[in-house]
Amino acid sequence: MSRPENPSALHILAFVYLTFSHVTDGVLAPEELDTIARVLQGWLPDAAPAVIQRVLVESAAWVNEFADDDERLAKAEEYADLMRQQMNEKQRQAVLVNLILLARADGQITAREESFIARLTAILDHA
């Protein structure tokens, strides 16, 4: 499996959230996966849970296609720039709040999580 043929906005959000969880502490804890599913559902409240699950599976395969974390981070930053251009301020803030929720999901916030959030904040808040 590879990059979804026509990735939706939800796929892109899932990619960023999964990349965050993958590269910041190296382990995707069950609590983090549950939180990702919940925040994705918040973006598309009427979606069936099976749709959210499919997006997660496809996006996880996509994240795993990259050779290393540097490539994953570069792509996540590219998508953050796209979000900055296409989302309103409230939506961009929601992305950042969701990252904070993910950081807290496993009960510990690491320096790498703080650094990732700071980097995406700088990108998303750049006018």
For each feature predicted by the language model, list its residue ranges.
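Small-residue-enriched hydrophobic alpha-helices in membranes
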Residues: 1-23, 27-127
